[in-house]
Amino acid sequence: GVTTSSDRQYEALADVMNHHTLDFIQLDYSLGNRNANDRLLPMALDKGVAVLVNLPFGRGRLFNAVGDRSLPDWAADIDATSWAQVFLKYVMSHPSGAIPIPGTTKPHHAEDNLSAARGRLPDANLRREMENFIDPLLG
């Protein structure tokens, strides 16, 4: 597999995917950084390449954007009870089957992150609503 956490390397990653058989790729993807949506994630889906996602919280940028806001009503539609679960469910709901690998040093955060794997995932319409919600907050 091949790993990158920089959008600047996406062109090189696409080139590697076109010329080599990979089992997986690992890249930066989140509700706040959707740059892999247009090319890399569809390419991975087409080629049957597993996708691991680093930085699913955007280095904390997503948490900073939502601050102390309450979860929107639509969070209940995907059985999310925390912002972390919302952000992880967004990543997991991509048709490529992306698997987020969030980092944490706190056991209660790890437990909350694992809860994102339970319940429903957003469909395409809710994914767009989530994007429309976060984009103005990120500026």
What is each residue range found by the language model?
Residues 3-7, 28-32, 56-58, 105:
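Active-site beta-loop-alpha junctions enriched in small/polar residues
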Residues 1-11, 47-55:
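Short N-terminal secondary-structure initiator segments
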Residues 32-33, 80:
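Charged, low-complexity surface patches
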Residues 18-24, 38-139:
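Structured C-terminal cap/extension of enzyme domains
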Residues 4-20, 37-40:
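Distinct, well-ordered alpha-helical segments
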